[in-house]
Amino acid sequence: MIVKVRVIPNAPENEVVSRIGSVLRVKVTAGEVNEEANNALRGYLAEFFEVAPRAVNIIRGAKGREKTVEITGQPEESLRRVMESIP
């Protein structure tokens, strides 16, 4: 499943803030230095969607806050249900 993500770094905790259509707004505790935010995002999304960290790949936007992320490791239907549960 392909997901658009807007990352908010330096947050007090990792959390999915909201979903607007297929775009997730995600806060991560890591800063923007040396891939820290990308690694934190991968780890958090893996936990959130219940997949292995290697199943979360940033395919576009690795150096910006707007990212396109591919999530594999679960059936598309299961991942879509998780997405739809986000307010």
What are these regions (language model features)?
Residues M1-V3, I20-L24, A52-R54, R65-K67:
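A generic structural signal for short beta-strands and their flanking turns/coil linkers
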Residues V5, L45, V56:
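Residue-level signal for inorganic ion chemistry
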Residues R6-I8, K27, I59, T72:
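Solvent-exposed beta-strand sheet faces enriched in polar/charged residues
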Residues R6-P9, A40, E50-R54, V82:
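Short amphipathic alpha-helical surface micro-motifs
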Residues I8, S18, E50, G61-K63:
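A generic structural signal for short, solvent-exposed coil/turn residues
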Residues E15, R19-F49:
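Compact, glycine-rich, soluble single-domain proteins
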Residues P53-P87:
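C-terminal structural segments of small proteins and small subunits
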